[in-house]
Swiss-Prot record:
It comes from Oryza sativa subsp. japonica. Residues 1-28, 94-156, 221-222, 298-303, 365-395, 446-451, 499-778 are cytoplasmic. It is a multi-pass membrane protein. It comes from the Eukaryota. High-affinity potassium transporter. It is found in: Membrane. One of its GO terms (molecular function) is potassium ion transmembrane transporter activity. The chain crosses the membrane at residues 29-49, 73-93, 157-177, 200-220, 223-243, 277-297, 304-324, 344-364, 396-416, 425-445, 452-472, 478-498. One of its GO terms (biological process) is potassium ion transport. Keywords: Glycoprotein, Ion transport, Membrane, Potassium, Potassium transport, Transmembrane, Transmembrane helix, Transport. Residues 655-704 are annotated as: Disordered. This is Probable potassium transporter 13.
C-alpha cells in the first residue's frame, strides 16, 4: 500500500486494442466491480422512497391517480437524470478519465481563463495532457463567454465558490447517505417485531456503520469484489419481487410509464403533490456518485452496468411496490417490507442490510476522490492520501476523512433516529449537487466542446427545469431537517475557501517578494558568501527568481551548498502528467554558479509515491540535462524558455529514461575517469538498472567540461544532501478588515497548524531538513 501515490492506471482498461479479449475482459471486470462501489446508493432507494413521499399530507384514493402519478414521476426522473443526463451525456465530459465537479472545473481552467486554479502557464503549454482534444474551430459564442469571464474577475470568484459549494454538498452526502441507508434497512425489523424499541434499531445501525468505515482501509478494489455479489443479489431480489408484485396485485400499473399521469397527478394533488417531490427526489440519490467515481472505473463499464442491470431492476422494483400499494393503501409507511412475500422476508431483509453498506460505499469513495482533488489543487488542507491499488490510480483511502465521516454519521444516526427528517436533509444535498453539475455542463458544452449555445441551453433547460422543481420542494423542508446539509456544506465551504485564499495569498506574497538573480549574486558577494560541500534542495512554490525565504536565510547565514537546486512541485489542471513530461530542468545563471531549477509537475489525481527515491531522481535529471544541453547545442524541440523570469534561464523537459516507479534505492558511482558517469538503481523486483553517460571518444573541450561538471555533481552528492523549506506564518495586515483578519489569522492559522507539515508531505528526512521561519503580512 503506497502513501501519497499509486501505480499507473487510467480508466483501468488493459493497454490492448479495443477488439482484443483482454480489453473486453478488463471492461467486464470493471463493470462487475462497479456494482460494489458505484450503484449501491441508487439501488437501495426503493426501501425509503415511497415512505418519504407519502410522509406528508399526500394520500392515496380509490382511483389510484396518486400512486400512478408518483410511479410515473419516479420512472421519468430515473430516465432523465441518471440514464440520459449522467450515463449518456455527463460521463462524456470526463477530464482524461476523471469525473466529478472538480474535473469539470479543471476542463474550464485548462481551456480558458475562467478558473482561478492553475491556469495554463507558458512552461506547461506543450504538455500532451493539454492537447489531447482534436483542435476545432472556436465558435463565436464560446469566445464571447470566455471573454466575459476573463473581463470580470468577480465572476471567476463566484464560479470557484459555486464549484466549492457543489463539492461541499457531495462531501455532505458522505455523512447522510450511510445514515439514511442503514437506518432504512434495519427499520424492517420492526415489521416483524413491532414491540422492538427504537433504541435497538439505532444501536444496530451504529454497529453496521462502524463496520463499514472500518473496512475502508482495504481499498476500493477489495471492497468492490466483496460488495459486488451483495448488490447483484439485491438487484436480483428487488427485480424479481417487483415482477411478482406486478403480476399478483396490479399489472395495469404499467400505464404509469405514460407522462400523462404526471400531469394528472399535479392536477389532482396540487400543493400536496408538489410537496411530495421532496420524497420522490430520493430515487435519484447516487446519480452524482456515478460521475464522481469515474476515476475508479471507465465510462464503458459504468454504462454497461447501469443500462443492462441497474436501470431495469430499479424500474421493476418501483413498479412492483406501486402495484402492491394500489391494493394495500394502509401500508404506506412500510410498503417495501410489507410487499415482500413471507417466504423471502428474512433473506431479503438480510441482503438489504448488507446492501445498505454497498449503497454507502459509493458516496464514501466519491468523497475520498473529491477531497483528494481539492487537496491537490490547494483547496483543502494537507492530509494523508493512501493509494490502495497499484493498477488503478484513482482508488484511494484518506484516514482522517474516513474517521470524521464515521463520527458524523454516528452523531446524525443517534440524533435524528428517523429516516423522514434525514430524508429531508438528504434530498436537498442531492439536488443541489445536480444543479451545480448542470450549470458547469453549460460552460463545458459551449467553451470546451465548442457546440452551439442552443445545445447547451437545451441541456440546461431540460435537466435544470426538472432539478429546480425538485429543489423548490426540498427548500420548503429546510426547517424539518433540510438545514443539516446546509450546515455541513457551509462548514466545509468555509474550510476549503479559507485554505485556498490563505494559500493563494502566501504564494502571491512569495512571487511579489522574490529576489532576481543579479541582485542575489550581488548580495552574496557583498556579504562574503561561503559555498560549503554538498547538494542543497530548496523547495518553494516560485518557478523563477530566488524565493524570499532562501534570500532571508542567506542574509542571516551567508553560506549554502556548492550545488543548489531550486525545486518547485506543481499540481496542474490535468488528472495526470506522463513520466516523460514530469521534470522540467534548467540552469540558473552561468555554469560556474552551479545553480539549477527543477519544476516537477503532477496532475491533481496523482501523488508523491517516490519519497525515498526522489532525491536521486532529481539528480539524475540534472545529469541528463547537462548531457542534453551539451548534445543539443542549446536548442531543440523540447526546450522551453522561462521568459517570465527575466534571467538567463532555459528549461528543458527531461524525459524518463525508463520506468522508475519500482525503484526505491539509487547509488551514484562516479567513474574513474572524467569521461563517464554511471547511475545504478536497484529495482524493487531484484534487478539492477544502469543509466550511463559516456563521451564517445570525441575528446572535445565541451565534452570534457560536461563530464567534469557531472563528476563534480556526483562528488557533491557524496558529501551530503540537505533540504530547505520555508516555515511561514501568514498574518493579515494590520489595516485589513475584521473579516480578513478572522479568516487568515484564526481559521487559516488553525488549519495550517493542524494539517500535515510540508516536510512530511514531501517525505523529507528530518535529519537533513532545514526549515526557515518567516512571517508574511498579506
Amino acid at each position: 500500500m503506497d502513501v501519497e501515490g499509486g501505480g499507473g492506471g487510467g480508466g483501468g482498461a488493459p493497454p490492448r486494442g479495443r477488439n482484443s479479449w483482454g480489453w473486453q475482459k478488463g471492461t467486464l471486470l470493471l463493470a462487475y466491480q462497479s456494482f460494489g462501489v458505484v450503484y449501491g446508493d441508487l439501488c437501495i432507494s426503493p426501501v425509503y422512497v415511497y415512505k418519504n413521499t407519502f410522509s406528508g399530507k399526500l394520500r392515496l384514493h380509490e382511483e389510484d391517480e396518486e400512486i400512478l402519478g408518483v410511479l410515473s414521476l419516479v420512472f421519468w426522473s430515473l430516465t432523465l437524470i441518471p440514464l440520459l443526463k449522467y450515463i449518456i451525456l455527463v460521463l462524456g465530459a470526463d477530464d482524461n478519465g476523471e469525473g466529478g465537479t472538480f474535473a469539470l472545473y479543471s476542463l474550464l481552467c485548462r481551456n480558458s481563463k475562467m478558473g482561478l486554479l492553475n491556469n495554463m502557464r507558458a512552461n506547461h503549454g506543450s504538455l500532451s495532457a493539454y492537447n489531447k482534444e482534436e483542435p476545432c474551430k472556436e465558435s463565436r459564442n464560446s469566445m464571447l463567454i470566455k471573454a466575459f469571464f476573463e473581463k470580470h474577475y468577480s465572476l471567476r470568484v463566484v464560479l470557484l465558490l459555486f464549484v466549492l459549494m457543489g463539492t461541499s454538498m457531495v462531501i455532505g452526502d458522505g455523512v447522510l447517505t450511510p445514515t439514511m441507508s442503514v437506518l432504512a434497512a434495519v427499520s424492517g425489523l420492526r415489521i416483524k417485531f413491532p414491540e422492538l424499541h427504537e433504541n435497538y434499531t439505532v444501536l444496530l445501525a451504529c454497529v453496521i456503520l462502524i463496520g463499514l468505515f472500518a473496512l475502508q482501509h482495504y481499498g476500493t478494489r477489495r471492497v468492490g469484489f466483496l460488495f459486488a455479489p451483495i448488490l447483484i443479489s439485491w438487484l436480483t431480489c428487488i427485480g424479481g419481487i417487483g415482477i411478482y408484485n406486478i403480476i399478483k396485485w396490479n399489472p395495469s400499473v404499467i400505464r404509469a410509464l405514460s407522462p400523462y399521469y404526471i400531469y394528472n397527478f399535479f392536477r389532482k394533488a396540487g400543493k400536496d403533490g408538489w410537496s411530495s417531490l421532496g420524497g420522490i427526489v430520493l430515487c435519484l440519490t447516487g446519480a452524482e456518485a456515478m460521475f464522481a467515481d469515474l476515476g475508479h472505473f471507465s465510462k464503458l463499464s459504468l454504462r454497461l452496468g447501469f443500462t443492462i442491470v441497474v436501470y431495469p431492476c430499479l424500474v421493476l422494483a418501483y413498479m412492483g411496490e406501486a402495484a402492491y400499494l394500489s391494493k394495500h393503501r394502509e401500508d404506506l409507511q412500510s410498503s417495501f417490507y410489507k410487499a415482500l412475500p413471507d417466504r423471502v422476508f428474512w433473506p431479503v431483509l438480510f441482503i438489504a442490510t448488507l446492501a445498505t453498506a454497498v449503497g454507502s460505499q459509493a458516496i464514501i469513495s466519491a468523497t475520498f476522490s473529491i477531497i483528494s482533488q481539492c487537496r491537490a489543487l490547494g483547496c483543502f488542507p494537507r492530509i494523508k492520501v493512501v493509494h490502495t491499488s497499484s493498477h488503478v490510480h484513482g482508488q484511494i483511502y484518506i484516514p482522517e476523512v474516513n474517521w470524521v465521516l464515521m463520527s458524523l454519521c454516528l452523531a446524525v444516526t443517534i440524533g435524528f433516529r428517523d429516516t423522514e427528517m434525514i430524508g429531508n436533509a438528504y434530498g436537498l444535498a442531492v439536488i443541489l449537487v445536480m444543479c451545480a453539475t448542470t450549470c458547469l455542463m453549460f460552460l463545458v458544452i459551449t467553451t470546451v466542446w465548442n457546440r452551439w449555445v442552443v445545445w447547451a441551453a437545451a441541456f440546461t433547460v431540460v435537466f435544470g427545469s426538472v432539478e429546480l422543481l425538485y429543489l423548490s420542494a426540498c427548500l420548503a423542508k429546510v426547517p424539518h431537517g433540510g438545514w443539516l446539509p446546509l450546515l455541513l456544506s457551509l462548514t466545509t465551504l468555509l474550510v476549503m475557501s479559507t485554505w485556498h485564499y490563505g494559500t493563494a495569498m502566501k504564494q502571491q506574497h512569495e512571487v511579489q517578494n522574490k529576489v532576481c538573480l543579479d541582485h542575489f549574486l550581488g548580495l552574496s558577494s557583498g556579504i562574503g558568501l561561503v559555498r560549503v560541500p554538498g547538494v542543497g534542495f530548496v523547495y518553494s512554490s516560485t518557478t523563477n527568481g530566488v524565493p524570499p525565504m532562501f534570500a532571508h536565510f542567506v542574509t542571516n547565514f551567508p553560506a549554502f551548498h556548492r550545488v543548489l537546486i531550486f525545486v518547485s512541485l506543481q499540481t496542474l489542471a490535468v488528472p495526470k502528467v506522463s513520466p516523460e513530461e514530469r521534470f522540467l530542468v534548467g540552469r540558473i545563471g552561468s555554469p560556474a554558479n552551479r545553480l539549477f531549477r527543477c519544476i516537477v509537475r503532477y496532475g491533481y489525481k496523482e501523488g508523491r509515491w517516490d519519497h525515498f527515491n526522489f532525491e536521486n531522481q532529481l539528480l539524475m535529471k540534472v545529469v541528463e540535462f547537462l548531457r542534453h544541453q551539451d548534445g543539443s547545442g542549446g536548442g531543440g524541440g523540447d526546450r522551453m524558455s522561462a521568459a517570465a523570469s527575466g534571467e538567463d534561464e532555459a528549461m528543458s523537459v527531461i524525459p524518463a529514461t525508463s520506468s522508475s516507479g519500482g525503484s526505491n534505492q539509487h547509488a551514484f558511482d562516479a567513474g574513474t575517469t572524467t569521461s563517464s558517469c554511471e547511475i545504478d538503481a536497484t529495482a524493487g523486483g531484484g534487478g539492477r538498472r544502469k543509466v550511463r553517460f559516456d563521451n564517445d571518444g570525441g575528446g572535445g573541450g565541451e565534452e570534457e567540461e560536461e563530464a567534469a561538471e557531472v563528476k563534480e555533481l556526483m562528488e557533491e552528492k557524496e558529501a551530503g544532501v540537505s533540504y530547505m523549506i520555508g516555515h511561514t506564518c501568514v498574518f493579515a495586515h494590520e489595516s485589513s478588515s475584521a473579516v480578513k483578519k478572522f479568516a487568515v489569522n484564526v481559521v487559516y492559522g488553525f488549519l495550517r497548524r493542524n494539517s500535515r507539515r510540508p516536510a512530511v508531505v514531501l517525505g523529507i528526512p528530518h535529519t537533513s531538513l532545514i526549515e526557515v521561519g518567516m512571517a508574511y503580512r498579506v
